[in-house]
Each structure stands twice: as structure tokens, then as C-alpha cells.
Amino acid sequence: MNYRLVILFSSLLAATANAGNTDWPTYGNDAGSSKYAALEQINSGNVADLRVAWQWQSPDTALGKADPKQTPWGFKSTPLKIGNVLYISTSLGQVAAINATNGQTIWLFDTRTYDDGRPTNLGYNHRGVAHWSNGKDKSIIFMPTNN
């Protein structure tokens, strides 16, 4: 299967200039999981102008092609945005940092938990990562593994 994270943005570049300054640091955006951001770049007047800015291919795709037993069940992860970086987990338990502007992979950490074999539940699934920061100079991306 081919999984892609698709990021859309308005063709009005000036309107999206401040979007890079807004983080989405947790699932649901805040401790209350409101899933809301007070942004005004996309509205009823320009939503029809949205276009694909970039696509990101999950590294799980290559693993699934090399060994069909490693094919994920689905892609259910929600990325976090910290600064100009998206952090995401893949169904096979990899963690990626992605440049939010151009979709290029900055780094990838492979836990190799898929080496333990397919889980007996619904197969390979992963829902995301968590972020912690001391508010100064230390930051941690946390991900529970599939095994």
C-alpha cells in the first residue's frame, strides 16, 4: 500500500505566512483535545483555492513492498507540529521528522518492532507521538512501540 501524508495550503502565500508560527504540540492541539486552532488563513472565501503543497511517502511503503507480511493495516497517525517540523509515527513503528514547508524527511528513527512479527489484533497500527519540552532548550519526542 502507498501511504502519503498530504498537506494542503492556500494559494494565497501571504495569507499563510504566519501559519509557520503556530504549533500543534499535542493530539487535539491542546490538553483538552479541542482540535481547534484560532487561525484565519483558510476560510469560506478561499477554501476552494486549496492545493496540494507536497506529499510525503511513508517509509512503511518500501518495507511492505520488500515483505508483504509487513504491510500496515492503515495509516492512523496524527502528526504534531513544533516549529517548522512535523513529527509523526508510522504504522510499522517508525518515527519521522518532516520539514513542514517542503515535506522533506529531516530524520527517521526505525524501532524495528515489526521484526517481532505482525500483532494478533488488527495488525500494524500506530496512532502517534507525544512531545515534551522544558520550555527552554530540551525537547523529547515520545513514542510507545508496537511490541
Q: Which role does the model predict for each range below?
A:
Residues 24-28, 70-94, 120-147:
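Repeat-blade elements of multi-bladed beta-propeller folds
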Residues 1-5:
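Positively charged n-region of N-terminal signal peptides that target proteins for export
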Residues 6-15:
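Bacterial N-terminal signal peptides
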Residues 20-70, 74, 104-118:
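Aromatic (tryptophan-biased) beta-strands that constitute blades/sheets of beta-rich domains
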Residues 15-16, 84:
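Charged, amphipathic alpha-helical interaction segments
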Residues 100-102:
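Short loop/turn segments that connect beta-strands within beta-propeller blades
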